């Protein structure tokens, strides 16, 4: 089966590099399914899971925003942060979820609601990818 080269890169360095049959990402405009030979595209990403399918198996990588650049034979994901399922510390992710939820529930005047919502989304995404 045909494959496409996928690189996931953060400011801290590469996170993932493999030949994949299909990539699914959550873009600002909606979900994108990318197969080999896809038309060139650049799209901003939402917080979400990147699904990478190969040989009947699906791997997941949690990404926190960024961009996807698609070429017919190569997909590059430039993410603000990214972690493979194996690399996620579940206890740390759960603690981050609890902190974000507490900030949202506090309703104090100095709470930055948008930042707390984004922190909660990131924590929930990490927990989802890690499989709780």
From Swiss-Prot:
Top-rank taxon: Bacteria
Bias (Basic and acidic residues) ranges: 88-102
Chain intervals for the UniProt region annotation (Disordered): 88-112
GO CC, one annotated term: plasma membrane
Major site of localization recorded for this protein: membrane
Record Pfam families: ATP-synt_DE, ATP-synt_DE_N
Alphabetic keyword roster: ATP synthesis, Cell membrane, CF(1), Hydrogen ion transport, Ion transport, Membrane, Transport
Membrane topology label: Peripheral membrane protein
UniProt key word Cytoplasm: no
HAMAP family: ATP_synth_epsil_bac
Entry's family note: Belongs to the ATPase epsilon chain family.
Subunit architecture: F-type ATPases have 2 components, CF(1) - the catalytic core - and CF(0) - the membrane proton channel. CF(1) has five subunits: alpha(3), beta(3), gamma(1), delta(1), epsilon(1). CF(0) has three main subunits: a, b and c. The F(1)F(0) complex interacts with SpoIIIJ and YqjG; YqgA is found in the same complex.
Record-given protein name: ATP synthase epsilon chain
Organism: Bacillus subtilis (strain 168)
Lineage start: Bacteria, Bacillati, Bacillota, Bacilli, Bacillales
């Amino acid at each position: 089966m045909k494959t496409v080269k996928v690189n996931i890169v953060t400011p801290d360095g590469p996170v993932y590099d493999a030949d994949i049959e299909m990539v699914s990402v959550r873009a600002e405009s909606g979900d994108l399914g990318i197969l080999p030979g896809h038309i060139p595209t650049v799209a901003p990403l939402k917080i979400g899971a990147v699904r990478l399918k190969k040989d009947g198996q699906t791997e997941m990588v949690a990404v926190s925003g960024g961009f996807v650049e698609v070429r017919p034979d190569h997909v590059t994901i430039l993410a603000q942060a990214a972690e493979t399922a194996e690399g996620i510390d579940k206890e740390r992710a759960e603690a981050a979820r609890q902190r974000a939820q507490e900030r949202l529930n506090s309703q104090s005047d100095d709470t930055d609601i948008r930042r707390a919502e984004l922190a909660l989304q990131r924590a929930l995404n990490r927990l989802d990818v890690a499989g709780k």
